[in-house]
């Protein structure tokens, strides 16, 4: 455990870690201070940071299990001590660390008797397990325990619904949040009109991120949310002449974008954010990492520019075009790129 004496700066606003410890492989703790703040600022920042820490940071989880030999979720399998439901609950608790975008596949194939733990999961190279000792199942007989897994990176919760069930496939209620808990408190000091505040922020994580990494990512996400407000132009905030659609000719992708850009003054392109257009999370994350936040940002990039984005594919460009057609009510010819 690392703990530092709290010293209050009277000059530059600054974050500082004053306590850090690792309680287990799946429980990290960090305590930070931000000072000096004017009266009222600490609560504003503390509330925003807590919400960003708990709701805006992405995590990686097992979201589905595939096995054709299992009749239903609450069945038991000969030679396995746990029920299928208990195995699903154990898989739900597996903590993963990754740079994954979207979904990926993994698997387990173990011959009994013996214990199946997290270290038996065969993962893609860009995904790793935080705690290899996490228990999955106990094999009591000489049987082959082979299942497929679906891994996904997302944020918040993923609640299984009836339409998510498929033959031989069982969804898991996934909790993507790497931050287990976050609290903030405020200490005031000074006299009269000179009162200032110190913000104390406590962060607990599941080990896939350190509290310091979580704080950095939450801060980055908050900054990204506010950046568009720095570029607002008054003349682009509202639709003009009741123009709700943009007619485009069936040209190439580049020509379509050029046509939209030419007509951009007729629509509030800067007030339409890409997260409003139902883009898949992988495409959205790629665009966000390239500082593309609004429809105007998107239309200022050519097809060649988009293809230079890391992890971007031609299919993604087609999907973006489909979104443009949907939201601008455009009837375009389907050209091959």
From Swiss-Prot:
Keywords: Chloroplast, DNA-directed RNA polymerase, Nucleotidyltransferase, Plastid, Transcription, Transferase. GO terms for cellular component: chloroplast; DNA-directed RNA polymerase complex; mitochondrion. It catalyses: RNA(n) + a ribonucleoside 5'-triphosphate = RNA(n+1) + diphosphate. It is an enzyme of class 2 (transferase). SUPFAM superfamilies: C-terminal domain of RNA polymerase alpha subunit, Insert subdomain of RNA polymerase alpha subunit, RBP11-like subunits of RNA polymerase. InterPro entries: DNA-dir_RNA_pol_insert (IPR011262), DNA-dir_RNA_pol_RpoA/D/Rpb3 (IPR011263), DNA-dir_RpoA (IPR011773), RBP11-like (IPR036603), RNAP_asu_C (IPR011260), RNApol_insert_sf (IPR036643). The keyword Ribosomal protein does not apply. It comes from the Eukaryota. Residues 265-337 are annotated as: Alpha C-terminal domain (alpha-CTD). The keyword Hydrolase does not apply. Its main location: plastid. It holds the Pfam family RNA_pol_A_bac. DNA-dependent RNA polymerase catalyzes the transcription of DNA into RNA using the four ribonucleoside triphosphates as substrates. In plastids the minimal PEP RNA polymerase catalytic core is composed of four subunits: alpha, beta, beta', and beta''. When a (nuclear-encoded) sigma factor is associated with the core the holoenzyme is formed, which can initiate transcription. This is DNA-directed RNA polymerase subunit alpha. It comes from Nicotiana tomentosiformis (Tobacco).
């Amino acid at each position: 455990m690392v703990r530092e004496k709290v010293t209050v700066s009277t000059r530059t606003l600054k974050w500082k870690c004053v306590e850090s410890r690792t309680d287990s492989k799946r429980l990290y703790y960090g305590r930070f201070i931000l000072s000096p703040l004017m009266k009222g600022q600490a609560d504003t920042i503390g509330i925003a940071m807590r919400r960003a820490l708990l709701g805006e940071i992405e995590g990686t989880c097992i979201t589905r299990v595939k096995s054709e030999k299992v009749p239903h979720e609450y069945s038991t399998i000969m030679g396995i001590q746990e029920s299928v439901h208990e195995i699903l609950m154990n898989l739900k608790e597996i903590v993963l660390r990754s740079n994954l975008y979207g979904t990926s596949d993994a698997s387990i194939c173990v011959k009994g008797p013996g214990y199946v733990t997290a270290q038996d999961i065969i993962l893609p190279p860009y995904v790793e397990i935080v705690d290899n000792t996490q228990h999955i199942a106990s094999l009591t007989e000489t049987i082959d325990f082979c299942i497929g897994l679906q891994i996904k990176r997302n944020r918040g919760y993923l609640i299984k619904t009836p339409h998510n069930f498929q033959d031989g496939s069982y969804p898991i209620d996934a909790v993507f949040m790497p931050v287990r808990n976050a609290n903030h408190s405020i200490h005031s000091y000074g006299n009269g009109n000179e009162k200032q505040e110190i913000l104390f922020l406590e962060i607990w994580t599941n080990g896939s991120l350190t509290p310091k990494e979580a704080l950095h990512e939450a801060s980055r996400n908050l900054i990204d949310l506010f950046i568009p407000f720095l570029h607002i132009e008054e003349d682009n905030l509202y639709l003009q002449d009741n123009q709700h659609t943009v007619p485009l000719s069936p040209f190439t992708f580049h020509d379509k974008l050029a046509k939209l850009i030419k007509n951009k003054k007729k629509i509030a392109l800067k007030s339409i954010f890409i997260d409003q257009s139902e883009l898949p999370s992988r495409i959205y994350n790629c665009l966000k990492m390239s500082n593309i936040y609004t429809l105007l940002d998107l239309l200022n990039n050519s097809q060649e520019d988009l293809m230079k984005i890391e992890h971007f594919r031609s299919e993604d460009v087609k999907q973006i075009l489909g979104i443009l057609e949907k939201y601008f009510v455009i009837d375009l010819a389907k050209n091959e790129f």
